[in-house]
């Protein structure tokens, strides 16, 4: 079959116009076109047909040095990337090229980054909890298999460490794989994450097939086309893991979903579309829906996504975060105030929530214990002003008891992480859900009122707290 060849007629930043004159056939919308800029392959994605013989494209790489008249070849399909276990332990860019300097990714499976969401008949409607082994999450804001979790956190509160522990625990407990999509990521942060994963054993350089994670990066310095599509590239790899070997549980991280929206806004402006509210693209809801609807469980496996979400100017009504919220099943909020107390993971037990914290799904005991824990913590929070002004002595005996229990609960919500062993020297703990519920049930019922506060800090199960109390005496 003869190749469909065109020539570049106009270049405006990341937008490139290509004219096809040979047989009058235009490439389809979303097709990938290839050209070479001084031996460097550049992929262009068809965005618009602007006449009988010209297409307008978005470049997936820098157009610096590209000139008019350069030959462009229609590949005949959308962007295709390598998928499967060969991607484990590797970093690739939006078009599937390795960027870790470790040679080509030799995968026999190549897949388009555009796929329809699974059919309704193939989707699973069961709601099962994904046990993470992290007490505060499993008890108060449980994740669901195939669910979407929003992770809100500023700089330095432990977001990366929490992400790495989730990667480690889910892979260990479920034998599942993880995909990390760095969307508009700072190159330094992406580099740090990669090296931390190597140090903590999540990536095995000697035997890459034993790694638990595949990484796809579209850094902050890259053109908007790459940043707008890199989440789809990551999701395509996650889907391949979900559907292989009779199904897998896959964890899919996106950092940051706001930058995916922001890149879409830039692309929209470059294509001359009329902006909608606050300057965002008119297709904001559609773009978000196309990504989010593919993140789902089938009868064979699940994709559970954890999405870091930046909230511009702390305005939750901004169209970008507001559109994301509509798709989330749970929110995990990391708090600087809790991090300042030295309690890690610094998850806010009162701000974080989950749709699956429902007696019909988690069971009556789990639901009851979680609500009692939150009630004790909420009472303690409302008493803090009184304590700050008048001191503990002015409280009633009942309130004093509540404060003592709340402080123990606060400390028991902390736990040592496997991936932080290098820094803390403390052995990481994976806590089963039954042990988590039993421990907090005993705390709210007053069974451990005689144990010192320090015994509950940075331990796994309640038995470890009892053992620690013996050593403190």
Swiss-Prot record:
Family membership, please give it: Belongs to the ATPase alpha/beta chains family.
Q: Which organism is it from?
A: Rickettsia massiliae (strain Mtu5)
Protein name, please?
ATP synthase subunit beta
Mind telling me which InterPro entries this protein's record contains?
Answer: AAA+_ATPase, ATP-synt_VA_C, ATP_synth_F1_bsu, ATPase_a/bsu_AS, ATPase_alpha/beta_chains, ATPase_F1/V1/A1_a/bsu_N, ATPase_F1/V1/A1_a/bsu_N_sf, ATPase_F1/V1/A1_a/bsu_nucl-bd
Answer whether the UniProt record assigns the keyword rRNA processing to this protein: no
- Residues the entry annotates as binding ATP: 153-160
As recorded in UniProt, its EC number(s) are 7.1.2.2
Q: Name one GO molecular function term.
A: proton-transporting ATP synthase activity, rotational mechanism
**Superkingdom per UniProt:** Bacteria
Keyword Nucleotide-binding annotated: yes
Chain ranges passing through the membrane: none
Which reactions is this enzyme annotated as catalysing? ATP + H2O + 4 H(+)(in) = ADP + phosphate + 5 H(+)(out)
**HAMAP family listed in its UniProt record:** ATP_synth_beta_bact (MF_01347)
Q: Where in the cell is it found?
A: Cell inner membrane
